[in-house]
């Protein structure tokens, strides 16, 4: 993946020198969702010490050790020296990791306080360090404040343009803002600077957005091969499975999910993947049981939504309603802790009842950014409110990169049907089902019934 080679999966030569320490290296974890991406800087992480350095504590936590213990140790250091900016930065990073690892957003304000305190102390001594700026960028990404993330990333790049992590912050922000050409160029620079799990996974996403599923799988497989720990490999293997599942390859996805689970039995998303495989194979009870276990261990909204829709499909409407209440409570908790959830609210409320709130949230998010998925949310919210002419324009914009996403095609088909374009509706709905006939427990059955009613064939 040398310059201008996003279409290649050949491992590149490392042509720029790494110039940062361990704390900066931690950021790759937060940006791709892995579990141990810290690079060695020549220090033996296993060597006994009486007072571990802040970055060593973060490295230990991110490599799979007790994140709570790492945070407690950093807090002890800060009680002894409240103006230890390096420990504050490390504490902020560890709190972001705790939020991600536990689906508990109450850690984000603590991360914010620690990182801003570090920046204030560093500013008094001259300027915030590269590590702190990258940490603030990672926190902004986690809270879906992509404009701020881009700002912090660019400031960090001025201080150190030789580290791959800074291009992760910048590129992730650009892609979420809908600045695709800029993002793809940034990801290429990341690959050229520091090839590895974080860089290859971004290449995979860039290819997926452009409808290149095979290339996306190749790049994510390269990420798995490059993984430096079982936890990183489990993360990448799971995402290979996600790519296959979204492309309708249930058997291949099942193999990848099981491989992920074997690499790291504690990795909950692999269990969610296997629950979706059970749904795809028609075992609704097994799918529900799988998601109940997932939600008990990791109550992220996406998992609770799947559980609620599976329960509805099984005719267990009262239990499904209880899970929908949980989804709204999660969204409220996220918002209360500084996470922007307008995109999620727009799609969820368009599906489950509050059409006015869906459109408010979609418009609010569109004012902030113009990604294909925000365009899709605008389309679906407008459709829910009966404005299908406007919805179609947004739906077409959502598809302009050529993304092979069954849900985007389903939305397009239902909008065309509402406009009386039966042929167009059949075309889009059939395409959705050919991409992935199991894309949603709620919408896939509707798509199948609608195509049959309109006389189409999948």
Regions found by a protein language model. Name each.
Residues 3-131, 437-438, 445, 451-456:
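N-terminal leader/linker segments that initiate helical-solenoid repeat arrays
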Residues 90, 135, 169, 202-203, ...:
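Canonical tetratricopeptide repeat
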